[in-house]
């Protein structure tokens, strides 16, 4: 059986996505998609690339994701799905690229600097 692979990263999260022709079953780390992301409204955003190319019920997705929090994992899955779809059909790139699904979000947490409380928060300044 043919399958298509895409890797997605976001913050500290890394998602490995395998798409196979099927009926729309999505499994994340061995659990059902809704079970893994239960109660998170944002989770549906991970499946947006499939909606964009009208392929929502046409593929089964087997996803392993590790690292980061749930939000970063959702965005990592989104990128992985988009890349796997382009592997399946290179013509999808024209639809997915303008919507930003093939762009890796490079924003990561800024490091804490010495002499500061956080990355930018400085100790309170007293004039006198």
Swiss-Prot record:
InterPro entries attached to this UniProt entry: Ribosomal_Su5_D2-typ_SF (IPR020568), Ribosomal_uS9 (IPR000754), Ribosomal_uS9_bac/plastid (IPR023035), Ribosomal_uS9_CS (IPR020574), Ribsml_uS5_D2-typ_fold_subgr (IPR014721)
GO MF annotation, one: structural constituent of ribosome
A GO CC term assigned to this protein in UniProt: cytosolic small ribosomal subunit
The keyword Plastid appears for this protein: no
A Gene Ontology biological process term: translation
Family the UniProt entry places it in: Belongs to the universal ribosomal protein uS9 family.
NCBIfam families: PRK00132.1
Function recorded in the entry: Part of the top of the head of the 30S subunit. The C-terminal region penetrates the head emerging in the P-site where it contacts tRNA.
Listed PANTHER family: RIBOSOMAL PROTEIN S9, SMALL RIBOSOMAL SUBUNIT PROTEIN US9M
Protein name, UniProt field: Small ribosomal subunit protein uS9
Gene: rpsI
């Amino acid at each position: 059986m043919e399958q298509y692979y895409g890797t997605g990263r976001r913050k500290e999260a890394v998602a490995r996505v395998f798409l196979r022709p099927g009926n729309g079953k999505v499994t994340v780390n061995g659990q059902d998609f809704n079970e893994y992301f239960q109660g998170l409204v944002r989770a549906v955003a991970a499946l947006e690339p499939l909606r964009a190319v009208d392929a929502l019920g046409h593929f089964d997705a087997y996803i392993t994701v590790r690292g980061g929090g749930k939000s970063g994992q959702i965005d990592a899955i989104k990128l992985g799905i988009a890349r796997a779809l382009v592997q399946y059909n290179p013509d999808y790139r024209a639809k997915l690229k303008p919507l930003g699904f093939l762009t890796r979000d490079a924003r990561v947490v800024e490091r804490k600097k010495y002499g500061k409380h956080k990355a930018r928060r400085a100790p309170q300044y007293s004039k006198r």
